[in-house]
């Protein structure tokens, strides 16, 4: 019985930590508005488009998509935020005496990217239509950085107007024209990191379409707009930002549900075991209970007598289970987010739940013991 209670505590503690992890991840503010965004992927290069033709296609497609009823704004980028992918690049800061090579996340973004994703502008400006396309021989291309980039590499200095070079495999040079708010980049779990945004060119792209209605309802209109320009261009990975985030939490949700199921099952078995044990004890000690009542014990005294046994067993199992949980939950550390393996709130909640269930399991045997007739009990063999 003690082992059953201990295992229930162990299972419920793990389940509690995993459920709290899931809730913490779902409540994260990723730094942009994830609601009402339709995502779809295009790769014109598969149909023989070069970079220049891709840019022309995108410039024609954007106003067509914005003309769809219910569409608020449209943009595109090399990859979507929270895609699970990791894109980084190296660069140097012009004017640094040591000419240090730095590293940052980077994302090529199209017109109205920050407005569509609702990433707040903190200083300077975001990309303008004049930034698409820039002349190939333009010495300094515009760049927008996030707040963490400015904080990491420029400290308390003004980042606007600063120049960086050697960006990407082409070693391009950029002038910082704006600073925007921090966003989660790869996943909800990923830490905020320095991020560099540059104007997107042609080639493969993810389109982000913000709507005032259910994003799924405009999919036929989006397909029609694309096919009107080129009916041989396929759309890939049609999705909504919300659904994409929900799917990214599939593992956490599955583990939380399974652990909750097994935790609840172990608690139920412990409850049944405690009830069965106390029922057996009441039957076995019926004569003793009758003697106690004949000697003046009140029903409330009998109630306390039986409940005390159940609580003692539960407490012993709970203490053993708590020590086991403290030792075992540290192996869950890699699965947790926003909660420590030894989180006191979780352990207190589990102990409270066990106490309530234990009292409920003690109730029926205790009630039966209170109703024992002393005269019948004294003749009980």
What are these regions (language model features)?
Residues 272-313, 371-379:
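Intracellular coupling helices
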Residues 1-21, 253-287, 315-316, 356-360:
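Hydrophobic alpha-helical transmembrane segments of multi-pass inner-membrane transport and secretion
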Residues 23-43, 67, 120, 190-191, ...:
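Membrane-proximal juxtamembrane linkers immediately C-terminal to transmembrane helices
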Residues 124, 146, 296, 321, ...:
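Conserved G/P- and acidic residue-centered "switch" motifs that form tight phosphate/ATP-binding loops
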Residues 20, 308-370:
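Small-residue-rich transmembrane alpha-helices
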Residues 59-251, 257-260:
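Mid-to-C-terminal secondary-structure elements
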Residues 7-36, 279, 331-341, 366, ...:
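Alpha-helical transmembrane segments
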Residues 249-266, 308, 312, 344-349:
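N-terminal membrane-entry
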